[in-house]
């Protein structure tokens, strides 16, 4: 299962055939090009007045969108996802699609050859436009290389890419590519000589930074509503879900909430020979009655998780790849056992988990907002990797409603009295489902409790906090995959050693 796709402007059967040498999938003719969709990819299409609408991927908040469209059209209750977005687009305009959540790309193939493209806003399905021998639109750059060969993509110098900088959410290290701005409408068109270009505008204005000082009880009620909403949408489809469970607040809270919605929970904990959090995860599993599995990862498995995250999610940032390693190892462990997985990922950026208890911050909300924004280009929320393991990955914290609620929330709810994530701990405590020592346990990073960060450093011969070295290695692997010089099916230790030593 994969939602990878590409559109080639003025393409031909030959382009599709070239891709099919490396990737299973099918091609479909468009008004002025071809669409390629990987095998078993989730896609739907429908006819509308402007042309043919395509939805690649899935909607997460379908129930909400049906209720919205149903105000005007009863047919919304019978519509598939593509028809639902087309209906909202027709009735309310492109801006209405800012309300849609999911790992999707929606586009309209118009008879004049233009493509009107709507990108989702949370980094679940990053989309690029590439100017190679031909013009491409894709959420998987590997497909362009498969079609045009090793020289299809041109890369920025390593020194420029591996800097600890804040970047625009359109950033990509591929010089002849443009990452389409998330949460925007784009028109891919061409000039009088046939050269393609992109016109873009955002679907919404930036959120207000005015301090939100909600009273405690209404705030707790909103957190409860917004965290449960995605679980309520999933419950009719899945009896069993999987959860990566560290025993920290976020994964434990998601497990507790899921225990109210699903018949069976499979929980997974990972560690290394250096350290693990099995004591805490087992405590939560016992309290909630989950089917719990624990696994010690070797350094080879840690590196394999990093390599897979680079390949599938096209990550070039060392920290993001390191964090994803644990998740990819859980995907492998859970493959065939569950088809849906829930995580606590993203909570730290909303509720202050990355802040240091007792530290003084002039504007903690600004610091958190910068890190939320950063996820729009890192690839860490991309769903390709989980999909390749047959898993529908969901992050209940990463919703429009909860992100907006927390954006300007009073900092005292996030860091106060030598503690962080205060309001989330209060909420978890109010459920009376988790042991108090879990609710008030000190924060440890997802990659730190299992010492994945140290294992990565050991393989590179570096120090645990040297993320420039980690990013250099990650970017080298990223380039090797996107040039077609490495294959995910037969990456060898000697190839990786060459990339580590290359300086």
UniProtKB/Swiss-Prot annotation:
The record's EC number reads: 6.3.3.6
Changing residue 380 to Q: reported impact?
A: Reduces catalytic efficiency
Where in the numbering of this chain does the Asparagine synthetase domain appear?
Answer: 228-443
Read off the Pfam families from this record.
Asn_synthase (PF00733), CarA_N (PF09147)
The pathway is:
Antibiotic biosynthesis; carbapenem biosynthesis
- Annotated substrate binding lies at 346, 371, 374
How does the annotated pH dependence read?
Optimum pH is 8.5.
**What does the annotation say about its assembly with partners?**
Homotetramer.
Q: What is this protein called?
A: Carbapenam-3-carboxylate synthase
State which gene encodes it.
Answer: carA
């Amino acid at each position: 299962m994969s939602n990878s796709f590409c559109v080639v402007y003025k393409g031909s059967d030959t382009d599709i055939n070239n891709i099919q040498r490396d990737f299973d999938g099918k091609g479909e003719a468009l008004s002025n090009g071809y669409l390629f969709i990987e095998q078993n990819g989730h896609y739907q299409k429908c006819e509308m007045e402007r042309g043919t609408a395509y939805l690649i991927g899935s909607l997460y908040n379908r129930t909400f969108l049906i209720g919205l469209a149903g105000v005007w059209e009863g047919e919304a209750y019978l519509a598939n996802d593509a028809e639902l977005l087309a209906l909202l687009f027709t009735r309310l305009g492109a801006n209405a699609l800012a309300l849609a959540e999911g790992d999707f790309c929606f586009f309209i193939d118009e008879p004049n050859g233009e493509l009107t493209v709507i990108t989702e806003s949370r980094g679940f399905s990053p989309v690029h436009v590439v100017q190679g021998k031909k013009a491409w639109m894709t959420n998987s750059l590997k497909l362009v290389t498969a079609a045009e060969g090793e020289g299809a993509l041109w890369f920025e110098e390593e020194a420029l890419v591996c800097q600890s900088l804040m970047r625009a959410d359109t950033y990509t290290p591929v010089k002849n590519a443009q990452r389409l701005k998330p949460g925007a409408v784009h028109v891919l068109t061409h000039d009088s000589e046939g050269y393609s270009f992109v016109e873009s505008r955002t679907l919404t204005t930036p959120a207000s930074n005015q301090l939100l000082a909600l009273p405690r009880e209404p705030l707790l009620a909103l957190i409860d509503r917004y965290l449960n909403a995605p679980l309520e949408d999933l419950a009719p489809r899945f009896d069993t879900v999987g959860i990566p469970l560290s025993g920290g607040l976020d994964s434990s809270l998601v497990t507790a909430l899921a225990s109210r919605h699903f018949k069976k929970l499979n929980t997974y904990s990972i560690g290394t020979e250096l350290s693990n959090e099995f004591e805490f995860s087992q405590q939560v599993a016992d309290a909630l009655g989950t089917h719990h599995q624990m696994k010690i990862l070797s350094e080879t498995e840690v590196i394999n998780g990093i390599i897979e995250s680079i390949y599938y999610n096209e990550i070039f940032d060392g920290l993001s790849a390191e964090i994803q390693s644990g998740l990819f190892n859980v995907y492998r462990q859970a493959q065939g056992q569950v088809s849906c997985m829930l995580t606590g990922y993203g909570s730290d950026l909303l509720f202050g988990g990355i802040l240091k208890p007792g530290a003084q911050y002039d504007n903690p909300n600004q610091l958190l907002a910068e890190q939320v924004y950063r996820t729009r280009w890192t690839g860490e929320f991309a769903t390709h990797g989980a999909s390749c393991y047959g898993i529908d990955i969901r992050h209940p914290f990463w919703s429009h409603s909860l992100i907006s609620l927390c954006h300007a929330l009073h900092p005292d709810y996030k860091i106060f009295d030598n503690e962080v994530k205060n309001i989330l701990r209060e909420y978890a405590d109010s459920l009376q489902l988790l042991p108090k020592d879990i609710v008030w346990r000190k924060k440890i990073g997802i990659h730190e409790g299992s010492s994945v960060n140290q294992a990565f450093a050991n393989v590179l011969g570096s120090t645990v906090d040297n993320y420039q070295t980690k990013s250099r290695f990650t970017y080298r692997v990223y380039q090797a995959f996107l040039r077609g010089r490495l294959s995910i099916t037969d990456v060898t230790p000697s190839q990786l050693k060459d990339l580590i030593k290359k300086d």
